């Protein structure tokens, strides 16, 4: 039985797709496989994240780290640092300005 230790989500709304989300997703698959992590990492596309200034974004759980905007050339570093070595790839983090905004569960 496989034990998934991390889930990686890639935004796939229209703006993300226009900004290269599919290429980021494909490169993530390649790098995850290249590091032999395919049995430990779940990789999926997610819908609209409600932000359009840091797209595409990559979210890594269980840490809930948000990277963005991410381009395919940055994926090797992200996978090596965060998923392989277990360190936050600080250079790729989405800025706090891009993460601020209405919190969905507080908006009734």
PLM region descriptions:
Residues 1-108:
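Feature of Fe-S/electron-transfer and energy-metabolism proteins
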């Amino acid at each position: 039985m496989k034990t998934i230790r991390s889930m990686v989500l890639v935004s796939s709304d229209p703006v993300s797709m226009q900004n290269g989300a599919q290429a980021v997703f494909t490169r993530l698959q390649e790098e995850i496989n290249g590091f032999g992590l395919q049995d430990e990492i779940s990789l999926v596309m997610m819908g609209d994240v409600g932000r359009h200034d840091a797209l595409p974004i990559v979210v890594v759980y269980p840490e809930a780290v948000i990277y963005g905007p991410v381009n395919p050339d940055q994926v090797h570093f992200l996978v090596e640092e965060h998923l392989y070595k277990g360190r936050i790839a600080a250079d790729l983090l989405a800025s706090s300005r891009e993460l601020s905004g209405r919190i969905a569960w507080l908006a009734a």
